[in-house]
């Protein structure tokens, strides 16, 4: 667990990616992703725990695995991408945070998007969960944004 992690305009990749910080993780303009397709359990993939996450203009993506992000304060995903996809198995994106700013950003899962986020700002953004979207939000600001939940 580091005080702060700075991956701005950088690249972090691996079979499983576990990042833990007592401070802020800065991934603005950076990428955090898996370095190939693996046969993981659907619950495995990228796990980020921190006081805050800055993914503005950044990309957090896992193929054939899930993405879990837990922050105390804010997930900033303005013009950023958070994505978990799989052609087989149940993947998901799990978000726990006080605030989510997804202005102009995209959060996409071929499975579920779930968790607890008190305040969501999704102006011009897209939150798409093909297995459903359930973030238990208290406040939602969604000017020209899209939230798509598709149960096939």
Can you say where each PLM-predicted feature lies in the sequence?
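Extracellular beta-strand scaffolds
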Residues: 3-7, 11-13, 17-19, 23-27, ...
């Amino acid at each position: 667990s580091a005080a702060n992690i700075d991956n701005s305009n950088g690249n972090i990749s691996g079979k499983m990616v576990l990042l833990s910080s007592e401070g802020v993780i800065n991934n603005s303009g950076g990428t955090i992703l898996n370095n190939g397709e693996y046969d993981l359990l659907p619950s495995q993939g990228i796990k980020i725990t921190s006081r805050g996450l800055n993914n503005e203009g950044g990309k957090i993506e896992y193929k054939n695995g899930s993405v879990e992000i837990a922050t105390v304060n804010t997930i900033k995903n303005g013009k950023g991408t958070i994505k978990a996809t799989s052609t087989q198995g149940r993947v998901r994106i799990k978000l726990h945070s006080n605030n989510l700013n997804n202005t102009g950003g995209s959060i996409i899962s071929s499975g579920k998007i779930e968790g607890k986020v008190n305040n969501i700002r999704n102006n011009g953004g897209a939150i798409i969960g093909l297995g459903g979207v359930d973030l238990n939000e208290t406040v939602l600001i969604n000017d020209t944004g899209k939230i798509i939940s598709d149960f096939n």
